[in-house]
């Protein structure tokens, strides 16, 4: 607890004889910013909100030809970094491109199954979108393609509208429609510079959602891993486990389990080897492809498919056919496609931007978030017209891409070429690939999404964040992916509303032998001047919190008056509000200050404001509250305010 100063010989002193250090004899008045007309004020706010990075700064004072080239480079960064591209960079991109291709091919086949689509659509989605991104994206390290979480989310949302088994053609059309509008959503957010909207999904909520989705995805793989033919369509953990145990007596296939368990052990071992030595990064990257080749050959020579081992069977050969004519632009399915596309697009965008920023920070370069959104959006728009479903940045592939020494987005082009060759010549070889291998590959891929260390850190740092994390996690695994996402968004919004409507306030005291005033709970040695109560408001004061701020200040005052009365100290005569953290105030906030001022007047307590910012002091003058309060009751610092109050204090108890 802080100590309270006691008056000695009529002058305010503190325990131990401490007297607050006097500020400079020159007392500065609080500056009032020059008046701006409404249009200029609006344009300034608009610019700071949407164009704070001044995207046109490079275009200033440049000739038309230079501006055209800068504009072209802005939309297609390939024209920027492509000018300085060298064979040395190509060598790094070639190695990383071949490495991520070996990882993506088996993953794509499995991820397409998560979305309830034919495996070929997974390969299609790693051919066209990476080519578009390579031309328009600003990240050097991100690897594009289908990902587990988005595939599961898309499959769950689509299945809720159309059964893929009874109406496969309509289901496919809705998938392309959702992909188209996912791209439109992403591109629109970037074009209109609304990227800050994805920040409403907090890091804690994303950690919980991803962890829950990873467990859900792993549980879904038990169908292929155990060789179960009849499996629930639901994704919650109770329904899945119930389906698994019901099939235990007659539905499990021991050959399938043996294949899946053996290669999952191999994949996990390769991952451990890769972590132990950075030089062996290629081991876990190439392990999935080795698993597919070996298991496919084993099933082919033993004809294990005749013993109940489920295989991929037919995989169409050839490149992506056009699908523009399959997209719904009218009818009931249009609204469904828009709704699913917006949700899938936002989740895909959140994951991709987070991955891009992570690896950009590692290599000390910047990515333009809004340009990234446009690039990601355009690749999905083009993808939807070429038989692709929602693609985004893959963390596992991007990590391998980074470790392999990629230099530019050319690594995505190399990967696309390898996928193209696979589609043209190698797809028949996947006929005997066992589903258990695809299940093992997906389980191995989603394990890193369960970030226990991050959850522990969130719990230690912020309990409210942890509630968002755990709420999203349990929502996904016990109900459904979309409910988990809804919980994640809802709790994130609730936290924002709570912080806005219930801002923190603090009682300030003087740090001994200084003119500095700080929170008495943070600095127990800080002392309070008798007869003066100093309170800091740590937020802008708006209609949403103005009543709370006024009531909280009055409660601080009431509590302090009770302490003063019990200790027979001079009563509170001055209430100082430290306003430096108050960045803005609206009419409701000003009205709350007026009510507080009138209430204090009735109790013979003078209200004083210290260090209001330019926006705040300007509005206080425009509303005439500054005149009501009196110019001599507005000070530049708390120390100035306390110094002015001290001679006016009486010893009245």
UniProtKB/Swiss-Prot annotation:
Q: What keywords tag this UniProt record?
A: Cell membrane, Membrane, Sulfate transport, Symport, Transmembrane, Transmembrane helix, Transport
- For region Disordered, the annotated ranges are 1-30
The subcellular location is: Cell membrane
Give the way it sits in the membrane: Multi-pass membrane protein
Which SUPFAM superfamilies is this protein grouped with? SpoIIaa-like (SSF52091)
**Any one GO BP annotation for this protein:** cellular response to sulfate starvation
GO cellular component terms attached to this protein's record: plasma membrane
How is this protein induced?
Answer: In roots by sulfate starvation.
Query: Where, in residue ranges, is this chain on the Extracellular side?
Result: 113-116, 163-173, 216-253, 302-339, 394-409, 460-466
Tell me the Pfam families matching this sequence: STAS (PF01740), Sulfate_transp (PF00916)
Tissue distribution: Expressed in lateral root cap, root hairs, epidermal and cortical cells of roots.
Family annotation (InterPro entries) = S04_transporter_CS (IPR018045), SLC26A/SulP_dom (IPR011547), SLC26A/SulP_fam (IPR001902), STAS_dom (IPR002645), STAS_dom_sf (IPR036513)
Q: Which residues lie on this side of the membrane: Cytoplasmic?
A: 1-91, 138-141, 275-280, 361-372, 431-438, 488-653
GO: which molecular function terms? secondary active sulfate transmembrane transporter activity; symporter activity
Subunit text? Homodimer. Interacts with OASA1 through its STAS domain.
**What does this gene product do?**
High-affinity H(+)/sulfate cotransporter that mediates the uptake of the environmental sulfate by plant roots. Plays a central role in the regulation of sulfate assimilation. Unable to transport molybdate.
* Family, similarity comment: Belongs to the SLC26A/SulP transporter (TC 2.A.53.1) family.
The identity of this protein, by name, is Sulfate transporter 1.2
This protein's species is Arabidopsis thaliana
Taxonomic path: Eukaryota, Viridiplantae, Streptophyta, Embryophyta, Tracheophyta
What's the name of its gene?
Answer: SULTR1;2
